[in-house]
Amino acid sequence: MFRQFRSEVADALGDALASLDLPTDDLGIERPPDDMDATLASSVAFRLAGEVGDAPPNVAATVADAVDVDGYDYLAAVDTAGPYVNFHPGERYFVDTLDASAVDSGYGALPDRDTSVVVEHTSANPTGPVHVGRARNPIVGDAVANLLEYAGYDVDRHYYVNDAGRQMAVFTWAYERFDESDLAGEPARARAEYDLVRYYRKGNAYLEEADPEAVEAAEEEIAAILQGLEAGDEETYERVGEVVDTVLGGMKECLARLPAEFDEFVKETRFMRDGSTDDIAARLKETDHAVYEEDAWQLELDDWGIDKNLVFLRSDDTSLYTTRDLAHHEWKFDNYDRAVTVLGEDHKLQADQLDATLELLGNDIDRLGHVIYSYVNLPDGKMSTRRGTGVMLDDLLDEAIDRAREAVETRMDDRIRDDDLTEEDVERIAHEVGIGAVRYDIVSKQPAKAITFEWEDALDFEGQSAPFVQYVHARCCGILDEAADAGIEVPGVTADSEGVVDVGALDVDATVFETDAARDLLREVARFPAAIESAADDLEPHTIATFTREFADAYNAFYRECPVVTSDDEELRAARVALVAAAKHTMANALDVLGVEAPESM
């Protein structure tokens, strides 16, 4: 409804400006400031004041007088507030919003666009446990994929596996070279990546500390592995594959805890084995931007504003990561309409070089999008696993669950619902709230901004946190359960002697809402699909987190001012129950976009 209302506002305002012989290229339609009573506003008067030769408030009044609201489904009235032109919907807007949202558990999802998108995210090198500093990638990437699905795209989630670089050659050599007795200490966890990472650390330490002759011999073995991969040697692929698949299996278990799941794990060696990497290198050599310098083939990308050359082939004819990634991206373009990649800020140059080179090769890079993120820090400072130190994602999730469990148990006496929570219930809530707190705190920030993760903020039930917004959903569920127990019809379900049955839409009247709190909440419900559309267009899932906080504020005001089950007015009570159902669906789906559980009780 909000999307249609916005479209009607644009049409009406455009017609008004045209009738005044004023430009219509920038309508300035936006959400009004919080202290302004309007659903949409236009700041166009600021832009036109100079052209008209009058003060913005006077221009706004002239424009408002020229707006004709006749013939629109939702646009009903126009007025001004200083320099702003304000637009107001009629009753049908609220009626249709309540009808659509109260009975549709999938409310907010947009129609199918018949457009395929591949979202590549996480793609951490399979060299050991997932480090907490990289936790932003799977969390943001999963939210981007969810968001695009809600926006009507056909989405595949991919993890690009770096199984061809030097790190994996070193890992494979170390795994074959050393025995358990050579390793220091026990694995930090009983899982494959924690076990095998000890070989990787041992190998790197050996290469730094062993005598020069031993290191030279080791480097020859490592080089042979790399050459074997380039030559397509099946035995080498099997040797490397054993290490990669074992470590990756453990990493999958960690990521499943978030959860972050994938449709396909695409291996880098795939594009060496099928010849596409060689094809990329050959095509690049033929371009006017290719030069052979410093014993390597390079691309000069000055025409794209990039000072640093892209090295795409070494002197021994071995390819580099970016060369293989170019083949990978052309494969994406062959199989999907769009491609989105979530990358850490240290890959920004690589992303720019990739875009420029893909364009040089004749690809339409408008089909490619990047989400660049900064890293997650703990209060102690930046973390690194280069030496095998630091906090792992598993550690963060464990502590989140423990802290959430403690918070839930502390708040047991403050619960409004009179149901008894079992130990299993407490454990379930601890997982939903704890992991939700981590995900929400990370995804709620603009990706480009660095994060310092603070427990006090992430688990604050009264603050701008996951528990704060999750509690809205739990409250909705509690009210709807109470209504059903009292024999009150609930949109979608009602209680009878046989249990719970589907009853579809109810006969409720949204025009009976007499308080601003109810109308304001319904306005928030109405704009959810538009929030999905805008966030998907900009690849900004953090704006949905902002929506949940604003929605929670609106719901809590309604909760304080509008009794639902205890209302004496039957018609008003039915409408409020429907509004609670609409709020439940809206919050559940907003949280689903963010990958955060929506608890039924807390």
From Swiss-Prot:
Name of the protein in question: Arginine--tRNA ligase
NCBIfam families linked to this entry: argS
SUPFAM superfamilies reported in the protein's UniProt record: Anticodon-binding domain of a subclass of class I aminoacyl-tRNA synthetases, Arginyl-tRNA synthetase (ArgRS), N-terminal 'additional' domain, Nucleotidylyl transferase
UniProt cross-references to CDD domains, sorted A to Z: ArgRS_core
The family this protein is said to belong to: Belongs to the class-I aminoacyl-tRNA synthetase family.
Main location: cytoplasm
Localization of this protein: Cytoplasm
A GO CC term attached to the entry: cytoplasm
Lineage top rank: taxon: Archaea
Organism whose genome encodes this protein: Halorubrum lacusprofundi (strain ATCC 49239 / DSM 5036 / JCM 8891 / ACAM 34)
Lineage of the organism: Archaea, Methanobacteriati, Methanobacteriota, Stenosarchaea group, Halobacteria
Keyword vocabulary terms for this entry: Aminoacyl-tRNA synthetase, ATP-binding, Cytoplasm, Ligase, Nucleotide-binding, Protein biosynthesis
Reaction it catalyzes: tRNA(Arg) + L-arginine + ATP = L-arginyl-tRNA(Arg) + AMP + diphosphate
Any Gene Ontology biological process: arginyl-tRNA aminoacylation
First-tier enzyme category under EC: ligase
A molecular function GO annotation: arginine-tRNA ligase activity
Coiled coil: none
Gene: argS
Keyword Ligase: yes
Motif ('HIGH' region): 124-134
EC number: 6.1.1.19
